[in-house]
Amino acid sequence: MYKTFIARTKSIFLIALAVAGASIFMTNKNVTVASAESTAANPLLDKWEGPYGGIPPFDKVKVSDFKPALEEAMDQNLGEILLISANKAAPTFENTITEMERAGRTLARLRTIYGIWGGNMSSPEFQVVEREMAPKFSAMSDKITQNEALFKRIETVYNSPEKAKLTPEQQRLTWLQYTNFVRAGARLNPEQKARLSEINQELAKNFTKFSQNLLSEENDKFLVLAFEADLAGLSQSLRDSAATAATTKKVTNAVGIISNTRSSVDPFLTYSERRDLREKVWKMFVNRGDNGDAKDNNATISQILQLRAERAKLLGFKTHAHWRLENTMAKTPERTMELMEGVWTPAVARVKEEVADMQALADKEKAGITIEPWDYRFYAEKVRKARYDLDQNEVKQYLQLDKIREGMFWVAGEVFGFAFSPVSGVPVYHPDVTVYEVKDKKTGKHVGLWYFDPYARDGKRSGAWMNAYR
């Protein structure tokens, strides 16, 4: 769906968009960031070149390049970390915390592209790489957080009286590094650390399996609309979308299909007059990963819960929730539930009122039904029409994609002083993607590039999100 650029603050927005500046940083002039041979052979390890301060080489990416590039970048990162931990000089913010921030730039840049392929361009070939690399990423992370010499340096900086002389930002960064290491098991004994690493790798495998199963369910399952009568209630645009989806999936002898994604399911549940088909579509969507087949996620979920519980106990927490919330504003599961119940209780009460309105309308029409989940959107639209004379189809002409995008640009211009203009010649990872240069509206100074990828497709996970390339 839409990859919006909305951010909480201007600084976050700038981080998301900024592409200027160096891509590779070295912690020591004697460290080779990448060998000439491997860099030449694998474009994923290359520094981002070209205009706008360097741009991702999406046009050169091959799935087969990911594994060797990632493994080399991981080795580089570990080498940088070892240099920091082996430093004979007394630990300071500059030679420890700052150097840790500089370490791993090559890997971070590479994982940006890797993440884009995982969320936007997944394929069976790429998923093989994901399954192999997930536990390796976890093992590498544990090697860093379980490095005793490195943790001692961080701890020394954290407990040093000199910390008071640091800026608030530096103190915050020091606190984050120290806290993250402690939460990752830096204080455990060797036996506990070994078990923790095993748990983390198993979790990484299960998270990957869960995500891939869910994506497969969305890509492979759909409802066939075999007859013209199956389109009852759908607007022409929705009929066209269903027909296009059928063509894409090479489904013949059908007037269309409803894909197992929210962008396809929600409009069908809202407008289809075929209650029997609405039920099938609703169940298809909510039962993703819960069909007792090869893509069923129930056993995976159970394994994740067991591993999380064991990890929490190992780290000294009552439950995974206690560990997860310990460094957040809510702090505890109990406080979190209080916050949730404060919203949940009135929300449920309001939903019951809405369902009562829907049921009254259905009874008035002598529909002879009891409102079920697959009726909710359909009857919500009918109630809205009856009560307010508001038809969403009449509003749609003002909500075309181009107009929504222009509205986003206008808001960014008013709030942040940004101006957007389309650019060509910038590599993209899919033909759907369009690129815009962002400038300061007053000075004309380059701020960054914005990549817009609005459409659902096979291999792209559902939902709405934003990636920061650099």
Task: Describe each region flagged by the PLM.
Residues 169, 173, 205, 212, ...:
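Active-site-proximal, well-structured secondary-structure segments within enzyme catalytic domains
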Residues 12-24:
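Bacterial N-terminal signal peptides
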